[in-house]
Regions:
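Transmembrane beta-strands of outer-membrane beta-barrel pores
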Residues: 1, 56-60, 122-128, 157-163, ...
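Membrane-embedded beta-barrel scaffold of Gram-negative outer-membrane proteins
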Residues: 1-4, 146, 153, 177-242, ...
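Face-selective signature of the C-terminal outer-membrane beta-barrel domain
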Residues: 19-131
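Residues that define the transmembrane beta-barrel architecture of outer-membrane proteins
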Residues: 27-31, 98-102, 133-137, 179-183, ...
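Residue-level signature of outer-membrane beta-barrel architecture
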Residues: 39-42, 110-111, 135, 144-146, ...
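Repeated loop/turn-to-beta-strand initiation elements of outer-membrane beta-barrel proteins
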Residues: 45, 115-120, 149-153, 193-198, ...
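Conserved C-terminal beta-signal and adjacent last beta-strands/turns
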Residues: 50, 183, 269-369
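Gram-negative outer-membrane beta-barrel transporters
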Residues: 114-115, 204-206, 225-306, 340, ...
């Protein structure tokens, strides 16, 4: 593998970016088993559902790696650049990983009338690694109510118990499982005989032992992070289906906050807190084999302060498409992506990011038999 390091230079013929090589090999094995029983039972004149089950999994991993010296700074004149011959360090065996998870779960859905339903369940999970052994009973519950044939409201509660592989910088060991609680309230809807569906949800999640800023750590050859408590809360809105016989729409918008409860600062600022996705396609009535469409993807600003501040302002991407069914087996399709040639960064983390694809176009012929 090759890692990029450094910052681009704008004053001379060097890019300011050097290459660092690594040899890395990992062997891993995962074994899983599951048993589940489902059934129905009658109570108080209603039929209800229930299920119980057992999950077991075991994960083992062992890795060995060696870092080489820098290949030198890449010049902007690539034909004249000659990389330096690296010298390699000794091979290092990373600490082995082993995780065994066992869980027993049970749940039931109770029909308390034609429109009201309760969901109750619990999950006992035991997690054992080379660094710790933890267990927890995680209950969950939900309620749904059909206000009308078109609208259903719901509320849910879930207890969280999730293993992680990141190194806790305070203990220098694998971080203990994330624990927390999640709440959600929402309404789901269905119109036009199910051709169009919508939803709106409000949620809040509190999590302890959360990896606040995971960065690749050469000392452990895996991600390490300070551990803390976070709260995420927000709103999601969606609409999917047919507005008319010829017009299809997919709409999604979400806004949320992720807060470090100990410092009061924004958590994971490299994750957008607002996103909007709109996709529409239209079948031309006069030419029913022809379909045209467009999509817009937007997100608000993000930034990364792992080593130095790198910021990406809010941006939107515009894509278009057109397809034509020559017959039942052959279809022609043309796509145009990022039509405005927006320049943007993705994957900001650890002081690095990747430029998204510039404006590009594709023509395809698809065969189906």
């Amino acid at each position: 593998m090759l890692y990029l390091n450094g910052s681009p230079s704008a004053t001379d013929n060097t890019s300011g970016i050097s290459l660092l090589p690594e040899i890395y090999n990992q062997k891993f094995k995962e074994t899983t088993a599951n048993a589940d029983i489902q059934g129905t039972f009658n109570l108080l004149g209603q039929q209800h559902e229930a299920n119980i089950g057992y999950n077991w999994s075991k994960y083992n991993a062992q890795s060995v790696y060696s870092y080489g010296s820098s290949l030198g700074v890449i010049t902007t004149d690539l034909p004249s650049w000659t990389p330096e011959e690296p010298t390699w360090g000794d091979f290092t065996y990373a600490d082995p990983e082993e995780r065994v998870m066992k869980s027993v779960y049970g749940a039931t859905r109770l029909h308390l009338g034609e429109d009201l339903k309760f969901i109750l369940g619990a999950n006992y999970t035991e997690i054992e690694t080379l660094d710790y052994k933890k267990n927890k009973v995680s209950p969950y519950a939900g309620i749904t109510y059909n206000f009308t044939p078109e609208y259903t409201g719901y509320m849910s509660y879930t207890s969280i118990f999730r293993p992680q592989t990141v190194i806790d910088l305070s203990t220098k060991q694998t971080a203990v499982p994330v624990e927390g609680e999640s709440y959600e309230v929402g309404v789901k809807s269905s119109w036009l005989d199910g051709a169009l569906t919508g939803n709106i949800a409000i949620f809040r999640t509190d999590e302890d032992n959360f990896a606040l800023n995971p960065l690749w750590d050469p000392l452990y050859n895996k991600y390490s992070s300070p551990i803390g408590t976070i709260r995420s809360q927000g709103v999601e809105v969606g609409l999917t289906g047919k507005l008319t016989d010829n017009l299809d729409l997919v709409f999604g918008f979400s806004t949320f906050s992720l807060k470090n409860m100990e410092s009061g600062e924004r958590g994971r600022p490299n994750i957008p807190t607002q996103t909007l996705n709109v996709l529409a396609s239209y079948t031309v009535p006069q030419i029913p084999k022809l379909k045209v469409g467009a999509s817009i993807k937007w997100q608000d600003d993000i930034h990364d302060t792992s080593y130095s501040t790198v910021k990406q302002d809010a941006y939107a991407l515009l894509n278009v498409m057109a397809s034509y069914d020559l017959n039942e087996h052959v279809m022609f399709q043309v796509n145009g992506n990022n039509l405005t040639n927006e320049k943007y960064l993705t994957g900001l983390s650890g002081g690095q990011g990747y430029y998204g694809a510039p404006a590009n176009y594709t023509v395809a012929v698809k065969f189906k038999y």
